[in-house]
Amino acid sequence: MAASESSAALDRPDGLRHQHLLDLSPYEADEIQYLLDTAQEFREVLDRPIRQVPTLQGTSVASLFFEPSTRTKLSFNLAAGRLSAETVSLSKASSSVTKGETLKDTARNVEAMKVDVVVLRHPSPGAPHFLARCTDSVILNAGDGAHAHPTQALLDVLTMRAHVDSFEDLNVSIIGDITHSRVARSNVQALTTLGATVTLCGPETMLPVEMEAAMDVRTTTRLDAALDGCDIAMALRIQMERQNAGLFPSTREYHRQFGITADHLRRHPDLLIMHPGPVNRGIELTDAVVDHERSIILSQVTNGVALRMAVLYVLAPRREEA
């Protein structure tokens, strides 16, 4: 069985009190800020002609992705490579899961290969927590169902931090399918922990009413209300299968009510735009908004590598400590 977080925390090399990154609920504001500070240092490394450092040489990182991913998987692999870690990737199609192997068996086989860090994306909420209980490897959650996506939220707040003086004075609106969004949940956890004010906006069928009280946010079904006094608007990708489930009538109607346009930018001259990607152009955001100078979407992508370098740097075991 895995060592408990409390005992493992004593051995953390750089001050975090956690062995894993499963979700952000146990992380305090100072721990989040520490990860952001570390990521900012690696952001500067990525601007150098030589972008690789030997920090995790000899450390092994396995990416287990049981859902499709492009940006997150590539970002984690690049981050591990920039730190000189040994990397191996496994997808559902190439794993023995297709032959009936359980997640627990997969974890034990990975551990038997002496893998230090497992980056896991899985369609089942709680899968990373399960893995953390049955292996001694460090587990990093790369997205589990609609539950959590902690590194996405951390790279988002890292991106925001470059444009604000204080999170305590920051107003962020998250717009879209909140109910089914792990990105929204993790961003709410990070932002409220740091002291920001968060508004959730979307169709009534996509707004979980329990989040307003449980997570100290406000909700609205009106885009204008969400953008009033807002500093940063984060649009979420609409999953087209939700239309088939009757959660919104059509993409045209969704865009009419919740799509952000150039007109919104004209009416809110200081508003910054974010999106975790991939963007459905013409639905969540118009082309003009995606490509606008106040869109910081590409900064999110760049910061993703730096943030994941920071997470690996802080949580991965050092070979000299083994």
Swiss-Prot record:
Main EC class the enzyme belongs to: transferase
Keyword Transferase: yes
GO biological process: 'de novo' pyrimidine nucleobase biosynthetic process; 'de novo' UMP biosynthetic process; amino acid metabolic process
Binding-site positions, carbamoyl phosphate: 71-72, 121, 149, 152, 277-278
UniProt pathway: Pyrimidine metabolism; UMP biosynthesis via de novo pathway; (S)-dihydroorotate from bicarbonate: step 2/3
Gene Ontology cellular-component annotations: cytosol
InterPro entries the UniProt entry points to: Asp/Orn_carbamoyltranf_P-bd, Asp/Orn_carbamoylTrfase, Asp/Orn_carbamoylTrfase_sf, Asp_carbamoyltransf, Asp_carbamoyltransf_Asp/Orn-bd
Positions that bind L-aspartate: 99, 182, 237
Keywords, alphabetical: Pyrimidine biosynthesis, Transferase
Reactions mediated catalytically: carbamoyl phosphate + L-aspartate = N-carbamoyl-L-aspartate + phosphate + H(+)
Molecular functions per Gene Ontology: amino acid binding; aspartate carbamoyltransferase activity
EC number of this enzyme: 2.1.3.2
Superkingdom of source: Bacteria
UniProt keyword Nucleotidyltransferase present: no
Record's function text: Catalyzes the condensation of carbamoyl phosphate and aspartate to form carbamoyl aspartate and inorganic phosphate, the committed step in the de novo pyrimidine nucleotide biosynthesis pathway.
Family that this chain belongs to: Belongs to the aspartate/ornithine carbamoyltransferase superfamily. ATCase family.
Quaternary structure note: Heterododecamer (2C3:3R2) of six catalytic PyrB chains organized as two trimers (C3), and six regulatory PyrI chains organized as three dimers (R2).
Descriptive protein name: Aspartate carbamoyltransferase catalytic subunit
